[in-house]
Amino acid sequence: MSRYRHALPQLVDRLFLTDAGIGTTRRMIMATIPHAHITTAALAIALGGMTGAQTEQTWTDQFGVEPGELASTGRNPYFVLEPGYRLTLEDGDERLAVTVLADTKVVDGVETRVVEERESEGGELVEVSRNYFAISKRTNSVFYFGEDVDIYKNGKVVNHEGSWLAGVNGARFGLIMPGLPLLGGRYYQEIAPGIAMDRAQIVSTNGTLKVPAGSFTTVLRIEETTPLERGAREYKLYAPGVGLLQEESLRLVQHGTVR
């Protein structure tokens, strides 16, 4: 899901009102844990979706999840995991369509939901990824189990850069969206050493934003970085009941269920 593999983040000079003041917007995302380690942990994920101490230098990479509590279908306030739900974001001739498919895939012993992302520029396909998610029936936290990626050039697949799966080559699942996002929460979204190590920090929980699809309040703003690319920094913005509003310069133009 991360677009870091294509280019360095571009600063998007769009003012965004947050509960911390006025900021600028940009983008990024993801994380992982072996099935053998999907056991009980100390603190409930509902309280920020994390366990373990949080300091300025640490990012949570262990999550208190029981295997039986994970499902392939559900609805987090900021992340809809229901078949047929689609988000379409655009910026000029750039387009991103995110669709929750009817398909599921077992990854690291867990049945996950397949979410397809199709990125295009000028009508030409740039990337198609099949992302694998599961949601906790207990906390509504959504976990990320990996992705299969096809990178296109001139209509042909040229590589699969960025692909990873939890349980393969030391990769572990990560947290894509806490059931109850708390200001300042820091966690890994992807844990695939050397391939994908995206991490997130919640920097605002009460923003407002206007996009082509409408005006939204209680907007969640997440800053994403990766230790694999020092200095890279992007932002994603989410609205309750809808999901992703903005990613870099891409802004939501349409959302809803498709048949």
Where on the chain are the PLM-derived regions?
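Cationic, low-complexity basic patches in intrinsically disordered or flexible, solvent-exposed regions
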Residues: 11
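Bacterial N-terminal signal peptides
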Residues: 39-48
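Conserved functional acidic sites
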Residues: 54-259
